[in-house]
Curated annotation (Swiss-Prot):
The keyword tRNA-binding does not apply. Residues 13-282 form the tr-type G domain. This is Peptide chain release factor 3. InterPro entries: EF-G-like_DII (IPR053905), EFG_III/V (IPR035647), G_TR_CS (IPR031157), P-loop_NTPase (IPR027417), PrfC (IPR004548), RF3_C (IPR032090), RF3_dom_3_sf (IPR038467), RF3_GTP-bd (IPR041732). It comes from Vibrio cholerae serotype O1 (strain ATCC 39541 / Classical Ogawa 395 / O395).
Length: 531
């Protein structure tokens, strides 16, 4: 953990870096808005829904996201809250972008899980929780949409415990729901916070009633709801877990908050808990050793590359999570994979699509480095030491298409666009060794649409897809050079290079893949590859 002797101890200890995970439509983008609003980072929280209107959620900033009202790429937003400085990483809400989300989860120290209280635990939430469990990431839970009719709150907590295998500790408890929603009782503060709906960027003054037995409570919410609240709380406090910060930090227990993001209610209670309990920047495993956040020398790793954040400049930004030390404008860094010293004078910080030049940044912060094709996902930057941070994955795609040009003269731009998009992890590109085809591989169908729309808007290339006889791909490697050469000679027609020039086996059927593996037991066929 952080040592208080560190010169920049105060800066690092106030950092909280977290991501929001949820099922699509559970209200994640609205929560992102309102978190920024309560952090006073956005003066007007624009609604996401009005697809025809000009107000788009601050974090959904690419053209296609604006059209469809879904967040497809990860945005980074930094804002102060209380005594803390919060780095919020917004992850794609659409299931096709699980890879991008997965990689983002390697760059955070905690997560906020948003659940639609009318629906409960949904499929995407299950998958994302599996990912957070690999690193025992601490989870804070927000039960959203209390201004609608919801499921029984006790049932919701049981479902989280049974399906997601994490103990629940309620911090606030709802009083009614839908039209009858009156507010929440804050168990830790022994006070009732009454609901008055705030819309857009208005945060209403909260009326607070101290104590559960206060007669004012009965007057404010009605005798029936007050009696129901006292009865429920007796049950809840008897049956649920007390909050234990150690268990929370181990990813075994989640504090649960209730509210409505759309009505600007409950988000601040959750933020209070998150900033109070979530960890400041954590140590991180490199292949060589564990790196502590309190170390003075700079280290960081690239978890995402985003092309064309500024269409005027055709640029690419590499998102770097700082693990230790301080970034200062103009400092020299070692780009470990290339073994090259680089001078970084123009790193940027983010406020969801708005960029500012970073003069300094600390462990836990995310900075953006301008990338002219030399930086890849998974790259490590240090102040001299040779380190490689581990655990940033690439997945074998499950869907494939051949990509064709409407104008054959634009082959060069097409290849450039595809390689750049594959470097940022939006899609994977395979170039078969035996022909000039370009095969695009994705984890979900939406990725194909994104690629065609971005090729058109960013590279001025009109492309179309055709079906291709590919069922799956595996990266191949072998320690025995001679046997590998023989394997390559025999399987020439099934081999391709990906965007990073790694050799992959392209199988027309799963049966074909199984046969190839049986025939060449010494060759490793990998479904995931570390960046």
């Amino acid at each position: 953990m952080l040592m208080s002797t560190t010169p920049y101890f105060g800066e690092v200890s106030k950092r909280r870096t977290f991501a929001i995970i949820s099922h699509p439509d559970a209200g994640k983008t609205t929560i992102t808005e309102k978190v920024l609003l309560f952090g006073r980072a956005i003066q007007v929280a624009g609604t996401v829904k009005g697809r025809g209107s000009n107000q788009h959620a601050k974090s959904d900033w690419m053209e296609m996201e604006k059209e469809r009202g879904i967040s497809v790429t990860t945005s980074v937003m930094q804002f102060p809250y209380g005594d803390c400085l919060v780095n919020l990483l917004d992850t794609p809400g659409h299931e096709d972008f699980s890879e991008d989300t997965y990689r983002t989860l390697t760059a955070v120290d905690s997560c906020l899980m948003v659940i639609d209280a009318a629906k409960g635990v949904e499929d995407r939430t299950r998958k994302l929780m599996e990912v957070t469990r690999l690193r025992d990431t601490p989870i804070v839970t927000f039960m959203n949409k209390l201004d609608r009719e919801i499921r029984d709150p006790m049932e919701l907590m049981d479902e989280v415990e049974n399906e997601l295998k994490i103990a629940c500790s309620p911090i606030t408890w709802p009083i009614g729901c839908g039209k009858e929603f009156k507010g929440v009782y804050h168990i830790h503060r022994d006070e009732t916070i009454l609901y008055t709906s705030g819309q857009g960027h208005t945060i209403q003054e909260e009326r607070i009633i101290k104590g559960l037995d206060n007669p004012e409570l009965d007057q404010a919410v009605g005798a029936n709801l007050a009696a129901q609240l006292r009865e429920e709380l007796e049950l809840v406090l008897g049956a649920s877990h007390e909050f234990d910060r150690e268990l929370f930090l181990q990813g075994e227990l989640t504090p649960v908050f209730f509210g409505t993001a759309l009505g600007n209610f409950g988000v601040d209670h959750m933020l209070d808990g998150l900033t109070q309990w979530a960890p400041s920047p954590m140590p991180r495993q490199a292949a060589e050793r564990v790196v502590e956040a309190s170390e003075e020398k700079f280290t960081g790793f690239v978890f995402k590359i985003q092309a064309n954040m500024d269409p005027k400049h055709r640029d690419r930004i590499a998102f770097v999570r700082i693990v230790s030390g301080t970034y200062k404008q103009g400092m020299k860094m070692n780009h470990v994979r290339l073994g090259k010293q680089v001078n970084i004078s123009d790193a940027v910080t983010f406020m969801a699509g708005d960029r500012a030049r970073a003069e300094e940044a600390f462990a836990g912060d995310i900075i953006g480095l301008h990338n002219h094709g030399t930086i890849q996902i998974g790259d490590t930057f240090t102040q001299g030491e040779t380190l490689k941070f581990t655990g940033i994955p690439n997945f074998a795609p499950e869907l494939f298409r051949r990509i064709r040009l409407r104008d054959p003269l634009k082959q060069k731009q097409l290849l450039k666009g595809l390689v750049q998009l594959s470097e940022e992890g939006a899609v994977q590109v395979f170039r078969p060794l035996q022909n000039n085809d370009l095969i695009v591989g994705a984890v979900g169908v939406l990725q194909f649409d994104v690629v065609v729309s971005r090729l058109k808007s960013e590279y001025n290339v009109e492309a179309i897809y055709e079906g291709v006889n590919v069922a799956t791909a595996r990266w191949v490697e072998c320690d025995d050079v001679k046997k590998f050469e023989e394997f390559k000679r025999k399987n020439q027609s099934n081999l391709a290079l990906d965007g990073g020039d790694n050799l992959a086996y392209i199988a027309p059927t799963m049966v074909n893949l199984n046969l190839a593996q049986e025939r060449s037991p010494e060759v490793k066929f990998r479904a995931t590859r570390e960046h």
